[in-house]
Amino acid sequence: MNRDNMDTTKRKEDHTKHTTDVIEFYEEGTAASSLNIATEKANSSPSILRRIINRAAWLSKKVDAMGVESTGIQRISPYERGTSKKQFLHVAGLWLSATGGLSSMSSFLLGPLLFGLSFRESLASSLISVTIGCLIAAYCSIMGPQSGCRQMVTARYLFGWWFVKLVALASIIGVMGWSVVNSVVGGEMLAAISNDKVPLWVGIVIVTVCSFLVAIFGIKQVIKVETYLSVPVLTAFLLLYISSSDKYSFVNAYVSKGNLDSSTRKGNWMSFFSLCYSITATWGSITADYYILFPEDTPYIQIFCLTFFGTFLPTCFVGILGLLLASVAMSYKPWSVEYDSHGMGGLLWAGFQRWNGFGKFCVVVLVFSLVSNNIINTYSAAFSIQLSSVFCAKIPRWFWSIVCTIICLVCALIGRNHFSTILGNFLPMIGYWISMYFILLFEENLVFRRFFLHLYTKEFPTVTGEINGPELVGSSKEVEKDAVTNIHLLKRKHKVTKHRYNWDKWEDYEVLTHGYAATFAFIVGVAGVVVGMAQAYWIGPIAAKFGEYGGDVAMWLSMAFSGVVYPPCRYLELRKFGR
């Protein structure tokens, strides 16, 4: 018995030593290590190339020394995570700051201003759709603590090693699209309060650069800054409710555009519904990123509720205010002029205008809500880029944050005079892919990881002896019954875990699914998008049945199409390949 204890102690010491080595490796920075290797290989290269590589290696070491997060898409193991209850408060502050800002409000403005809906019509459409979007984002977030992986890394268990790159690309477009919108809005606000002394392009540069300076440092700093920003930002929005209240009598003066027939109004209502759904559902592509430091056994219900209420309450708080301001602008000429001249920034300044200098100060505070939203977008987009190839994964995250910032800045400068067009026509497309991703994840967890776990013979290979960890018996038909028995034992041993994944295999190409079923279901879902979308450049045959401009139902059709196709395809895939 003493010998067994000695063996156990030795294994623990070896495991601890290995863990220490891994942590030290990441603290030194994977980027610097990669560049040092490249330096050795470049000894025979031209001197200019050697100097460039040496300079890059020196820069990488300097950046790591500043405390910049050097880890990329690597999984955070359970023993590397925190256990403090303050994590819940920090993440709650993050959601307050990120979702309770002008990026959320901007879409609500379009109900009256673009779609011609009354305040009541816009309110009903937006609240229902935002609730659905928050439910989807909250469900996606539960993958964070159990996996220790970024959201798009967990998608490898659905789409496989290769096809997940397409999903990562969609995620990049989504979060960077919002960053472009935020940068333009920030520029409009600074131009409005300065009477155009600060040009629009200068304001865009200021917002973009400020976002980058925080996002480059890593998740711990991002969460801290977001928490600190949430208090002044939400206070400023509360003051805007008060300052603009003297004009609320104009809200009901505007009913809806009289030249819209009943069918067209319904179509516009549906399109606005889809737009507001995208505001919160899009968070589903990155929500898990901010729970990877939570303990592995954190109850799912806690993560779900924290994400749902953390996104729902702030979004509704600023969204309803946006509807009030937009409805006033439709019937109150001075505010309408401000919106036509300076866009959303002018409308916000109009709401604060009676407070003069203090009102301008409040507008500047609101700009920080755009910065806080961009911080999250820039931080998470870098991981999706790393997921696109092995080469990109070797390049440090902070470098890709720089690339994302440059792309965002260029796109914002080019599209700065087409804000409503970008927001109304492009961003709803983001909700299409997240709808399909959600339904596939939901079915994978609810059906296959619950009732067909014995078919995952690659992920859970044959072992003998005591069940310890995620390893299960059952890699062939002869031992399938034993596999089912052992799975039941494992579930009783780990009662907290509802969905079974072998997260240690997150980068094992031989174990991860091929992704044939998910990819095929995704493609079928795209067919639903084509027939159901209503945008300026395309109105699908089903969407065209709702009035002159159509009604966007692409999210729901794509979700339905993918959800019907995936189960039979996934079952066949598991039977054929065991993964």
UniProtKB/Swiss-Prot annotation:
Compartments it resides in: Membrane
Entry keywords, A to Z: Membrane, Transmembrane, Transmembrane helix, Transport
Source organism phylogeny: Eukaryota, Fungi, Dikarya, Ascomycota, Saccharomycotina
GO molecular function: transmembrane transporter activity
Entry GO terms, CC: fungal-type vacuole membrane; plasma membrane
Function per UniProt: Thiamine-regulated, high affinity import carrier of pyridoxine, pyridoxal and pyridoxamine.
Protein name: Vitamin B6 transporter TPN1
PANTHER family: PURINE-CYTOSINE PERMEASE FCY2-RELATED, VITAMIN B6 TRANSPORTER TPN1
Organism, scientific name: Saccharomyces cerevisiae
Gene3D superfamilies linked to this entry: Hydantoin permease
